[in-house]
Design a protein with these regions (language model features):
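Compositionally biased, low-structure terminal segments
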Residues: 5-7, 18, 26, 170, ...
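Enrichment for repetitive, rod-forming helical segments
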Residues: 9-10, 86, 94
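Intrinsic-disorder/low-complexity regions
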Residues: 12, 103, 212-214
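Boundary/junction segments of secreted and surface-exposed precursor proteins
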Residues: 19-40, 44
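Zymogen propeptides/activation segments of proteases
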Residues: 19-20, 72, 82, 93
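Surface-exposed intrinsically disordered loops and tails
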Residues: 27-32, 89-124, 159
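C-terminal, surface-exposed recognition/capping segments
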Residues: 38, 42, 46-48, 55-84, ...
């Protein structure tokens, strides 16, 4: 079985979440820094095999889908958990020289085609052993094909009752909040509660990171 976490997006970023925690099946997972406790959701059978997701987005303070606390952090694709992903992090236009920047700021620069590093590396997030994998030990981000397999289960965009929206796959097997994104050019937050952008761990083509996205109009 393949195990995943959810990284949420910044015009190039994302993490997974669902409210359907089954206490009879799930077990606690503790991240390396000990700040968050995640739980496994029941397995989901897809055309890409059996997939197991954690119960919330990386950095989410709650798994209550009606709360903005379920939105979680906003990652730049391929970047490690270093503080840049926090919604209160500062921005900088200094492009990173290495895959582990010395600062914890969100890197913006309109001249670099949505990238935060001088020499992009397409393998920074491609599996659980990748250099910058942001997931708890043993977990990784879904691939583009795995996201498509989840979408093939069928989906529905639903209101939370608090003015925001979420998407439900496979008749409630996996629910994801519309957590919005952080603009790669400006650092501004956009579409919070209205759209969801979830990173894939692999790239669609050289230099082009993939993500699964949805909005309330669909």
């Amino acid at each position: 079985m393949k195990k995943f976490c959810f990284a949420v997006l910044m015009l190039i970023n994302t993490a997974l979440y669902s409210q359907n925690y089954d206490a009879g099946f799930s077990k606690p997972i503790i991240t390396e820094n000990g700040n968050f406790t995640y739980y496994e959701l029941p397995p989901i059978q897809t055309s890409e095999g059996v997939l197991i997701f954690l119960d919330r987005n990386l950095g989410a303070l709650s798994n209550d889908i009606t709360s903005s606390d379920s939105w979680g952090d906003l990652y730049q694709w391929g970047r490690a958990t270093d503080g840049h992903e926090k919604r209160l992090s500062d921005t900088t236009n200094t492009i990173a020289l290495t895959y582990r920047p010395a600062n914890n700021e969100f890197i913006v620069d309109s001249s670099r085609a949505n990238d935060w590093i001088v020499r992009p590396d397409d393998d920074l997030w491609n599996d659980s052993l990748s250099t910058n994998n942001p997931c708890p030990c043993g977990y990784r981000l879904p691939t583009e094909k795995e996201w498509r397999a989840v979408a093939d289960l069928g989906y529905e965009i639903k209101p939370t009752g608090t003015g925001a929206y979420y998407i439900s796959f496979g008749k409630g097997q996996l629910d994801l909040p519309c957590a919005g994104l952080r603009n790669a050019f400006t650092g501004n937050f956009q579409y919070q509660g209205m759209r969801g952008y979830y990173w894939a761990g692999d790239v669609m083509s050289k230099g082009m990171s993939g993500c699964m996205d949805f909005n309330k109009a669909e």
